[in-house]
Regions:
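Helix-loop boundary and gating motifs at the non-cytosolic
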Residues: 6-64, 224-274
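Transmembrane alpha-helix termini and helix-breaking/packing motifs in multi-pass membrane transporters
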Residues: 41-47, 100-109, 166-186, 258-260
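A membrane-interface helix-boundary motif in multi-pass transporters
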Residues: 112-116, 175-191, 263-269
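C-terminal transmembrane bundle of multi-pass solute transporters/carriers
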Residues: 67-71, 78, 84, 88, ...
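Substrate-agnostic recognition of the 12-TM MFS/MFS-like secondary transporter fold
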Residues: 20-38, 60-76, 80-95, 117-176, ...
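Helix-loop junctions at membrane interfaces in 12-TM secondary transporters
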Residues: 101-121, 313-324
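MFS-fold secondary transporters
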Residues: 45, 98-102, 106, 125, ...
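Helix-loop junctions on the cytosolic side of multi-pass membrane transporters
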Residues: 106, 138, 142, 180, ...
């Protein structure tokens, strides 16, 4: 009986226009970002042949993200969610546009300055992500009923991770054959499709009324809420540090070049491996949501994620590296759903 009820809920979500539009928005924007990430990483490593440049690329993204995340959350509470979503997508279109003259070689005369342009572009991507993530979460809560959240979250995870599988592969193939220019164009086009999808979005639930608190009061209230909930704080901190110290994919261009002597196609496939694991785990969790012992699953997922990253670090072959990255995706999907 419960299986039939679960199937009915799943079918209702899949035929909901608003839910489909939201998933299209998420898929297209994720494809845009993944193609950009693969392309920018390969681009800057080709220019510098220095693993440090990849670390700086990640830093260029994370600093704007963390600096604007709290303000972005307040903006999402106060402003139109659709407009903020369009703003985030528009930044991705702007990034792709800015990177075209760099990829075409028009700015080669700047020499070392070219990489700083790439860092600046990725910084804009970090700023966009700060607004995109909370906006999606609020739109998700408005499109679905509370009782549908568990399965809706699992479906959203499958869509997200599916785009994370396709995006890097497409990016790697575009870099290998047509070249960097085509990859940046593809990233911009997917961002445009995301703008169209979210512009068409119609809520099926009455929108949440904006808070009357000031920006700083809202930020302080949010921080107090998180720090007052020890279980929430511990879970968030555990997941954050696991991801912070386990971001193996950031170094993949150097790993491909120095250890595997591979090509952009190999980069795309390895970057897609965690997402493949997440898709399979998410598909399972969509039909079998975790209802009890969430803390145990979270601890096990974080521990498994750490061991998989260590295994990847010791890998000397493409197959072994892909296998360990696959399991990082499996454990990451569990932690996200929990």
């Amino acid at each position: 009986m419960s299986l039939k009820v679960g199937s009915d809920i799943l079918l209702a979500m899949l035929i909901s226009r608003a839910f489909i539009e939201l998933m299209l928005y998420r898929a297209c924007l994720t494809l845009s970002y993944q193609i950009l990430a693969v392309t920018a990483g390969w681009h800057i490593y080709e220019l510098t042949k220095d693993p440090l440049s990849l670390g700086l690329l990640g830093l260029a993204e994370v600093v704007p993200y963390f600096c604007s995340a709290l303000f972005a959350g307040h903006a999402v509470d106060q402003l139109s969610k659709k407009r903020i979503a369009v703003f985030g997508c528009s930044l991705h279109v702007l990034i792709a546009t800015l990177m075209l003259p760099v990829a075409l070689g028009y700015l080669d005369g700047l020499q070392g300055g070219v990489r700083w342009l790439i860092y600046a572009a990725i910084g804009l991507a970090g700023l966009a992500r700060a607004f995109i993530r909370p906006t999606y979460q609020v739109l998700f809560a408005q499109v679905l009923r509370r009782e549908d959240f568990a399965q809706g979250s699992a479906i959203g995870a499958v869509i997200f991770q599916g785009a994370q599988v396709v995006g890097p592969v497409v990016g790697g193939l575009l870099i290998a054959w047509p070249g960097l220019v085509s990859a940046y164009i593809a990233s911009g086009l997917f961002a445009l499709l995301a703008i169209i999808a979210v512009a068409l979005l119609r809520y099926t639930v009455e929108p949440i009324k904006p808070s009357e608190l000031s920006m700083w009061a809202g930020i302080v209230q949010g921080l107090r809420f998180v720090f007052s909930k020890q279980i929430m704080l511990a879970a968030m901190a555990l997941d954050m540090f696991a991801v912070l110290f386990g971001g193996a994919v950031a170094m993949l261009p150097a790993f491909i070049d120095e250890i595997l002597q591979g090509s952009p196609e190999n980069l795309g496939l390895l970057r897609a491996a965690p997402a493949i694991g997440s898709v399979l785990a998410g598909a399972w969790l969509a039909r079998h949501p975790i209802q009890r012992h969430g803390g145990r699953y979270l601890l096990g997922a974080v521990a498994g994620f750490g061991f998989a990253v260590i295994g990847f670090g010791w890998s000397t072959s493409f197959g072994l590296a892909a296998w360990f990255l696959f399991f990082t995706g499996v454990f990451d999907a569990i932690s996200v759903v929990v």
